[in-house]
C-alpha cells in the first residue's frame, strides 16, 4: 500500500508562516502526498507551487468551529476554488446537529457541495469528539444525502481526534462509495494503518513525513 497517496499533508496552525507552508508544499512534492491541506490564505501560493505535480490543493471551510453561516461557507468555497483549490474540507454546523435541526445541517453541506460541483471534492468534518454515536450516524447520513464526497472525523482543534471505532462506524454508515477521512492525532505509521484497516480512505496529518518514513520523532502536532 502506498500510504503517501492516502495522506493530506496538513498545516492549519494559526501561526504558520510562508516558510512553514512552503516546507509542507516541498515535502508534498517529494513524497507525493495526495494533497496539501492549508488555510485559505495559502491556496493561491500552493496552487502555483504545485502546478504540474500530482498533488491536490485542499483547504478548509467554516473552520474550525463550523458556526459560520451557510452563505459564508458557500462563498469561501467558491473563492477557494477560484484561487486554485481542488478539495475543500468543510465543518458542519455542530450545534444545529445537536439541536436536531437536520434541515439546516443538510442545507449547509448541500450549498458547499453545489458551490464546488465539478470543480472540487467536498469532505465534511463532523467533529466526532463532540458527538454521540447516534449524532455521528446522522451527520454521515446527512452528508451523503447532500452529495458530499467524503466524511471526515475531526478538525484537530477540538477535544479529540480520530479513533478506529469512529472510522468503522462512519464507514458502515456511508457505505463503500463515499470516502472516509481520519484526522486529528494520526502521528505514526501504526496509527495510519489502524485507520485504514478500520475503513479510512484518506488520512489527514501534519506528521505525514514521519508516517511515510515510519519514524515517530517529529510527530507531536494534534493534526
From Swiss-Prot:
It comes from the Bacteria. One of its GO terms (cellular component) is cytoplasm. GO terms for molecular function: deoxyribose-phosphate aldolase activity. It is an enzyme of class 4 (lyase). Its EC number is 4.1.2.4. Transmembrane segments: none annotated. CDD domains: DeoC. Pfam families: DeoC. It is found in: Cytoplasm. It catalyses: 2-deoxy-D-ribose 5-phosphate = D-glyceraldehyde 3-phosphate + acetaldehyde. Keywords: Cytoplasm, Lyase, Schiff base. The active site is at 89 (proton donor/acceptor), 152 (schiff-base intermediate with acetaldehyde), 181 (proton donor/acceptor). Pathway: Carbohydrate degradation; 2-deoxy-D-ribose 1-phosphate degradation; D-glyceraldehyde 3-phosphate and acetaldehyde from 2-deoxy-alpha-D-ribose 1-phosphate: step 2/2. One of its GO terms (biological process) is 2-deoxyribose 1-phosphate catabolic process. NCBIfam families: deoC. PANTHER family: DEOXYRIBOSE-PHOSPHATE ALDOLASE. Belongs to the DeoC/FbaB aldolase family. DeoC type 1 subfamily. Catalyzes a reversible aldol reaction between acetaldehyde and D-glyceraldehyde 3-phosphate to generate 2-deoxy-D-ribose 5-phosphate. This is Deoxyribose-phosphate aldolase. It comes from Bacillus cereus (strain AH187). The lineage of its organism: Bacteria, Bacillati, Bacillota, Bacilli, Bacillales. The gene is deoC.
